[in-house]
Amino acid sequence: MYQINLAIAGIAVGTVSLPVLSKALKNKNLKKIAAIQNKSFELSLLLSVPASFGLIFASDQIVNALFGYGTFSAIDVEMTAIALKFFGYGVPAFALIKILSNFFFARNNTRTPFYISIFIVFLNISISLSLFSKIGYIIIPIATSISTWVGVIIYLYLLNLKKSLMLD
């Protein structure tokens, strides 16, 4: 369910901004680069933050409306709603990852996003495996959200380090 928000907030914005950003970088138009990065970042957050709040605060109602019948028990609804709530905390990060990776792709740098993605996956798996026996299924959405936010921080750090991030 959180993937719908990712598709709208991250993938759509990223797909539209990548060719424009690539062209601005090729032309070394710093004002346009900054404007594209700002708009991409802002639009992504504008779409993903409200979606995140919706998933966090209305997860019970969403899951109940979609699955609260048939063989899906009340306990199943409750457990799924809790998982959705924790995925909700990661929605802005899921969208930002797509935007931030495009800042590298536009510069013909595919290695850095690849290595960051590998790190995020290993971090996610490590957190999940190390805490699954203590916390249970709920660690999976928690680990996914945490590892993705760590990825966002890494992207921002590396872009800032290379003076490639031009946000207001």
Where are these regions (language model features)?
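Membrane-embedded alpha-helical bundles of multi-pass transporters/translocases
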Residues: 1-168
